[in-house]
């Protein structure tokens, strides 16, 4: 805790060499090199009208390379009935392992953006409007393929399939919700949901997708686009 109820948090960790089977989804275990992680976070007094946070962190990937994360957030409370949270995280991934089926893993370098916000407005006693939004955009470049050996062990490289496995990925979800508290444990909800998953494999010579275009493609043609009305009613005393 710093003066003025500000906070500074530091962390450091070490991982020994070990076997791992999470990324392979149970299709064999492979050796992960020794590595570690560190993080630093600075946050201002959350009780004030404006509060901020800034964070940095790094983690070593399973077979080499460091991935770095940068995040920032702001919380605004202009008056008691309204609160707004805005957050942005960027990750620069180097050596990211992605499951490719059977006992195969792909190694990728990737840039990842994750903006989000959450807005709450208590319009009147018993009436609340909430809007939250989350998006993740990933642009990944393939750096090699590996296979888990029979009987587990160290990953072995696979040749002959490089150059056509880059991909873009976008995940979007947003919800606007109105809640009317009619009585204790009796509520009426009106909810709008919109969500989409965009995934595109890139071939040789395909242009790199701009982050704005990736967001637009994630927003267009949603797989979820619905209004829901719900009444929760309490029977009895």
Predicted features, each with a name:
Residues 1-237:
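Exposed, low-structure sequence patches enriched in small/polar residues
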């Amino acid at each position: 805790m710093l003066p003025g109820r500000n906070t500074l948090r530091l962390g450091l960790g070490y991982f020994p060499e070990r076997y791992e089977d999470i990324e392979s989804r149970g299709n064999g275990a492979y050796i992960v090199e020794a590595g570690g992680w560190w993080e630093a976070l600075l946050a201002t007094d959350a009780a004030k009208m404006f509060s901020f946070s800034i964070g940095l962190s790094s983690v070593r990937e399973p077979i080499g390379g460091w991935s770095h994360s940068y995040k920032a957030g702001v919380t605004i409370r202009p008056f008691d009935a309204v609160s707004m949270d805005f957050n942005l995280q960027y990750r620069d991934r180097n050596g990211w392992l992605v499951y490719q089926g059977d006992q195969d893993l792909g190694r990728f370098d990737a840039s990842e953006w994750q903006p989000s916000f959450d807005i709450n407005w208590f319009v009147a006693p018993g009436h609340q409007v909430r809007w939250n939004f989350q998006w993740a955009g990933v642009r990944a470049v393939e750096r090699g393929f590996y296979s888990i050996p029979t009987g587990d062990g160290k990953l072995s490289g696979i040749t002959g399939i490089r150059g056509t496995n880059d991909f873009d990925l976008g995940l979007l979800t947003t919800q606007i919700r109105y809640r009317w508290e009619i009585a204790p444990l009796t509520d009426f909800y009106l909810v709008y949901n919109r969500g989409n998953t965009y995934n595109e494999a890139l071939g040789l010579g395909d242009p790199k997708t701009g982050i704005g275009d990736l967001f637009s493609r994630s927003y267009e043609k949603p797989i979820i686009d619905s209004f829901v009305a719900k009444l929760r009613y309490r029977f009895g005393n």
